[in-house]
Amino acid sequence: MIYKVYYQNDQKRNPKREDTHSLYLEAPTEVEARALVEAHTEHNIEFIEAIEGETLAYEQQNPNYKLTEFSE
């Protein structure tokens, strides 16, 4: 499953919508997607959304779409 992870770069500052970023990640479950991001980044995760079907096709049209892979 592909997940879109919305996050802030810094865990110490209060989240601001204008500073929200996103990344795309392939993981078996939402819990595992969260664990991967937490283990490999300092991001403050706001929301994780499973995307598939037409939504995924739409996201893939964005030139900034790229699956993030973390090395173990």
UniProtKB/Swiss-Prot annotation:
GO terms for cellular component: DNA-directed RNA polymerase complex. One of its GO terms (biological process) is DNA-templated transcription. It holds the Pfam family RpoY. It is an enzyme of class 2 (transferase). Gene3D superfamilies: RNAP, epsilon subunit-like. It catalyses: RNA(n) + a ribonucleoside 5'-triphosphate = RNA(n+1) + diphosphate. Keywords: DNA-directed RNA polymerase, Nucleotidyltransferase, Transcription, Transferase. The keyword Magnesium does not apply. Signal peptide: none annotated. InterPro entries: RpoY. GO terms for molecular function: DNA binding; DNA-directed RNA polymerase activity. A non-essential component of RNA polymerase (RNAP). RNAP is composed of a core of 2 alpha, a beta and a beta' subunit. The core is associated with a delta subunit, and at least one of epsilon or omega. When a sigma factor is associated with the core the holoenzyme is formed, which can initiate transcription. Belongs to the RNA polymerase subunit epsilon family. HAMAP family: RNApol_bact_RpoY. This is DNA-directed RNA polymerase subunit epsilon. It comes from Levilactobacillus brevis (strain ATCC 367 / BCRC 12310 / CIP 105137 / JCM 1170 / LMG 11437 / NCIMB 947 / NCTC 947).
